Amino acid sequence: MASSEETPRSLAGKVALVTGAGRGIGKGIAVELAKRGASVVVNYNSAEKPAQEVVDEIAKTGSRAVAIKADITKVPEVSRLFQEALQHFGHLDIVVSNSGTEVFKPEDEVTEEDYDRVFNLNTRAQFFIAQHAYVHLRNGGRIVLMSSVAANMSGIPNHALYAGSKAAVEGFTRSFAVDAGHKKITVNAIAPGGVKTDMYDANAWHYVPNGKPGMPMEEIDKGLAAFCPLGRVAVPQDIGRVVAFLAHPDSEWVNGQVILLTGGSVT
């Protein structure tokens, strides 16, 4: 893994806002953008201490960061998040919507509460983050939304709610890319497979053949790595590096795309 000293500061002068950046994939994205010189707004909802630790880690890269609390399932809080970000840094160039919660539940047991909880965070929140980004980003900005390989996978039982919530995001991506074009803003989505986070720890066994609850993590990792030509599962830095590319000025011709981030895994 390259150190911050070895990473060109290709995003110097840019300001990024990353939702759900206090841990997991969001943290990995925030840190990778910071390594390249971007100032970063670290959004969190409840985990204030981890978010501040991300801010402190970013400071060690030589970049600036601020943690801002906001529940992005509530549109007034999304508006406040953007206003506070603009007040702090003066402008925004990059917005990464990293919200997501995963659920496995038989379709005949899904309740209204389940549906609202998953779609409010995975889908509705991402729409309004993209909407605010479209309004507030400077010309030439970058929007990156979060889909999942699950949006297009078949053969995973009890997964309709999560898969559907992410599939909608792919539709948002293509439509926003058209509408934001006059501002030279690109809009893309990433669709990671398994990434070593707390969500992975809780749910990855579902994707392993003959997986079961309580399965040792070493067996889960081995089972999923066997599908990948690179022989491992992803870590948040892998995702952050791709987002850093999409945030770079050189990525302008990548627009309206959903990029699978699986290391070439075949399941």
UniProtKB/Swiss-Prot annotation:
GO molecular function: oxidoreductase activity
Residue numbers annotated as active site: 147 (proton donor), 148 (proton donor), 162 (proton acceptor), 166 (lowers pka of active site tyr)
Enzyme Commission designation: 1.1.-.-
SS bonds (residue pairs): none
Keywords: NADP, Oxidoreductase
Binding residues for NADP(+): 25, 45, 71, 98, 162, 166, 195, 197
SUPFAM superfamilies: NAD(P)-binding Rossmann-fold domains
SMART domains: PKS_KR (SM00822)
InterPro entries according to UniProt: NAD(P)-bd_dom_sf, Sc_DH/Rdtase_CS, SDR_fam
Top-level enzyme category: oxidoreductase
Pfam families for this protein: adh_short_C2
Keyword set includes Oxidoreductase: yes
Protein function: Hydroxynaphthalene reductase-like protein; part of the Pks2 gene cluster that mediates the formation of infectious structures (appressoria), enabling these fungi to kill insects faster. The product of the Pks2 gene cluster is different from the one of Pks1 and has still not been identified.
UniProt family annotation: Belongs to the short-chain dehydrogenases/reductases (SDR) family.
Protein name: Hydroxynaphthalene reductase-like protein Arp2
Organism phylogeny: Eukaryota, Fungi, Dikarya, Ascomycota, Pezizomycotina
